């Protein structure tokens, strides 16, 4: 299973092609659009999300509500393109026209791809870099993840997310499954403890007033995974490695951990390893879940707990020092329309990126041409955990 996205932030559309989805999977576009809507929400978002109304159009790979087993193409229209039609159009324009529209960027933003991308691809107008490196591309990745969540639901696998920390204000590290799911999306910062939600909003408002931005930590939980997905045999087949690669590929994400993560370094092994238990109903299970559902690069049947660290967004309304690439003179960095905090939205993006990593691993573990075949193999693996 793989996918390819295309499109620029202010171009006409984002396009994604997904290959490897089994045939006969029931897909309702409204289920995908429900997930797309979640990405647009969250306290601290900028004006762009007031313009866009992200919805997906499926243009191939699905017929009469069911997947065909062929590549699935989805399109997300950029409504904001109407304001950028000439500057982002395909037809050539003169340097004078470009200058008059004041859209040329020569002052790279610290922490963004602007300068290095310009060097690498020889772009003197850094807009050519930021249009593709923008987090707008994550809308396409959420569409992919939403499709994967439809698949996972058919396998009785649940995946959900929350915000753990914003700007140093922290929620509890872990919640039991029932509390977690009962409190999803109860507030606009996506935190479980409603008592700290306002403190987070205040922190975001403070950053916005100061022309600054703040980051945070998000958490994704995957429940009811069959055991043994992934592998200890080769580095590139380890499930935690694959999830980690996906998470740190999200714009502005700078760290990932599983279960107790970096806190494991502070504790003895006797407090971190999860004891193996058995009963005839569950089969093998663990007495705790410090390791976040992963051992030896494989799922162990416990909830997979993924923590992702998002740095503050690099576009600042109180810009940092930079250098004009044409004159080499000191300037303040370019200001682009941006969010003061995108952590709540990033939790949704992270959830869908993890959903793809899980779905991809399952389809490699249980190679299946159609959904019925996949379901049967999952049932057999779950039974193995009891009978082994």
Swiss-Prot record:
Top-level EC class as recorded in UniProt: lyase
Example of a GO biological process term: amino acid biosynthetic process
Co-factor note (free text): Reduced FMN (FMNH(2)).
Alphabetically ordered keywords of this record: Amino-acid biosynthesis, Aromatic amino acid biosynthesis, FAD, Flavoprotein, FMN, Lyase, NADP
UniProt-annotated binding residues for FMN: 132-134, 251-252, 296, 311-315, 337
Span of the signal peptide: none
EC number annotated for this UniProt entry: 4.2.3.5
GO molecular function: chorismate synthase activity; FMN binding
Keyword Phosphoprotein: no
Protein name per the record: Chorismate synthase
